[in-house]
Amino acid sequence: LGGACVAGILGPLSDRLGRKKVLLSGVAFFVITCLLILLTHNIESFLVLRFLQGFGLSVIAAVGYAAIQETFEERDAIKVMALMANISLLAPLIGPVVGAFLIDHVSWHWGFIAIAFLAFLSWFGLKAKMPARTSSIPKKPLSYIWDDYMQVLKNKTFMGMTLGLPMVAMPLMLWIALSPVMLVEELGLSSMQYGLAQFPVLGGLILGNIVLIKVIDRLPLGKTVLIGLPLMLLGTAIVVVGIIWREYFLHCVILGMTLVSFGEGISFSVLYRFALMSSEVSKGTVAAAVSVLMMFTFFFVIELIRILYEHFHLWAYALSCFALIALWFTIPRGLLKTIMQQRKVNGEF
């Protein structure tokens, strides 16, 4: 939610000041908030600083992704995003195991110290290696920001493809949000067993991204999505089967979510590229619009399903995942097929 509040400003700001300056400022702000959270003594101040951390974190979605799409050629940009996804997955993959160890043996403070240190190192990496923008964008009055956003939001292809992104990403987000409750409280797994259960699920996403990198040059752009989404639908159906036969739920949910994460791995970066390139407006503004829509959707849908989970428990999770993927097969799938047909007519692979 914190990231969504400022992402809309960061994109247009990076169009005017340059991607590098805004990224460096965002990373520095994130490091500072990670260190300040060590001084908190109650849950209220802790949550305020977590909210502020979202400000710095949002520069990746609102500015960093736009910089990647502009710097690299089409398929290379998709490969870079897939590679970034694999690197960022180390946090939720290793985090539960390391976090359980820190809480049991040391203190939660060390987790934020480590995060601040790694972010501090990334600041120097960006400073040294990120290319500065050489082409200048004409500076328009600030009133044009609103006009640009209106142009983006009135683009039906953009809206359809962008709103399809949370449908694809949400089941895994729900897994990350609710798996501690499902596995530890509902099924009685230990903290270590819970951490180990994340490996096949998030490992599926890593494998999917690797497969995408390997095959993206051989298939028409978008083909991996048409392969990945049916796999995701199958995965969510397996989770529903696990709810019906409760004694097999643990095996079904891990198998099903592994298929879901693999399908997301071979699909999401391609869908993001199509969403970002569906508008002719400056990519900082478009990326910011994508980021804001996705973050608010994540926030509200996760909260809605959390409330449903309190009443319907595992059924709420399983049916929500299935419904989200099934929804993608409506308008977003039709738009994807249209884009692929248009690319074929234009002689684009």
Regions found by a protein language model. Give the residues of each.
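Helix-breaking motifs and short loop linkers at transmembrane-helix boundaries and internal kinks
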Residues: 18, 39-45, 56, 73, ...
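Paired small-residue
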Residues: 29-36, 44-53, 251-259
